[in-house]
């Protein structure tokens, strides 16, 4: 192979396999088909291996992934915030594709539907439900830092920082979003409603992840999981209530 004496990329003098200036590999100056194919495989591996390793690790041993990331092994795994946002985007796309809003709020039956007040309440409820379905993923993402804040306030024994609790919450809830997306897809062809198991699977997964991350007994881990679950649901309810109040205020002011 005819290797160049100077780097074709930055024109620096070459002394080895890689350029000391820009890092480009010292290969033949003439482009070959093998080089193109090898470059594709190299870049695919660089792009996909961390995400594949993260997905697999969070599936089989979520606590270990979180501990290793916190300990400094960050090159091996996808950034937790990036992972959570990516999983939320996948869940949003699946819900749009499958026609699943993910919520079933029915407040239109309050009171007597023949009265003006009931009609007004029904209209507010419908608008709230519609907007809530549209922004549910954002509410999910906003709830995760609050869950991490709760963990930071409750689990003081191991002296973990808020950022470490946040990385744990982002990873586990990101993976829960991904598992939800898979269950929504599988819900159509399977004769039983798989989505009804989501709350139970969430509690089991949170308990398992907390047990691996915080190294406490299974009972403490289950308690942390229940607190995480309640905090997350409570924040979603609060966000929905705030949204309803905003819609009500707009209707009262502008008619």
Task: Name each region found by the language model.
Residues 1-255:
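Membrane-proximal intrinsically disordered regions of secretory-pathway and membrane-system proteins
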């Amino acid at each position: 192979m005819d290797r160049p004496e100077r780097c074709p990329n930055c024109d620096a003098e070459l002394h080895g396999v890689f350029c000391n200036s820009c890092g480009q590999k010292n290969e033949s100056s003439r482009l070959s088909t093998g080089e193109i194919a090898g470059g594709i495989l190299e870049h695919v591996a660089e792009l996909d291996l961390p995400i594949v390793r993260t997905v697999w690790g969070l599936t089989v041993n979520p606590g270990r992934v979180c501990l290793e990331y916190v300990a400094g092994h960050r090159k091996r795994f996808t950034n937790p915030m990036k992972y959570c946002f990516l999983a939320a985007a996948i869940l949003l796309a699946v819900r749009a594709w499958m026609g699943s809003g993910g919520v079933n709020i029915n407040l239109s039956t309050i009171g007597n539907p023949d009265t003006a007040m009931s009609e007004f309440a029904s209209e507010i409820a419908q608008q709230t439900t519609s907007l809530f379905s549209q922004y549910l993923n954002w509410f999910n993402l906003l709830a995760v830092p609050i869950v991490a804040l709760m963990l930071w306030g409750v689990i003081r024994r191991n002296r973990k920082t808020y950022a470490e609790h946040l990385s744990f919450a982002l990873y586990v809830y990101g993976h829960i979003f991904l598992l939800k997306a898979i269950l929504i897809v599988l819900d159509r062809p399977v004769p039983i409603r798989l989505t009804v198991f989501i709350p139970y699977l969430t509690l089991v997964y949170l308990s398992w992840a907390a047990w691996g991350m915080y190294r406490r007994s299974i009972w403490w881990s289950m308690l942390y999981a229940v607190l995480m679950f309640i905090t997350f649901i409570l924040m979603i309810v609060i966000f929905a209530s705030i949204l309803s109040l905003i819609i009500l205020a707009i209707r009262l002011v502008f008619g």
